[in-house]
């Protein structure tokens, strides 16, 4: 769902 996408984006930002 939309929240899952948000969590994925947060994960990508955290890896930067």
UniProtKB/Swiss-Prot annotation:
Any one GO CC term of the record: extracellular region
PTM sites of type Leucine amide: 16
The keyword Secreted is annotated on this UniProt entry: yes
Keywords linked to the UniProt accession: Amidation, Amphibian defense peptide, Antibiotic, Antimicrobial, Secreted
Tissue: Expressed by the skin dorsal glands.
GO-annotated biological processes: defense response to bacterium
Keyword Secreted: yes
Signal peptide: none
InterPro entries from the UniProt entry: Aurein_antimicrobial_peptide
Localisation per UniProt entry: Secreted
Superkingdom, taxonomy of origin: Eukaryota
Protein family membership: Belongs to the frog skin active peptide (FSAP) family. Aurein subfamily.
Protein role: Antimicrobial activity against B.cereus, L.lactis, L.innocua, M.luteus, S.aureus, and S.epidermidis. Probably acts by disturbing membrane functions with its amphipathic structure. Shows anticancer activity.
Protein name: Aurein-2.6
Organism: Ranoidea raniformis
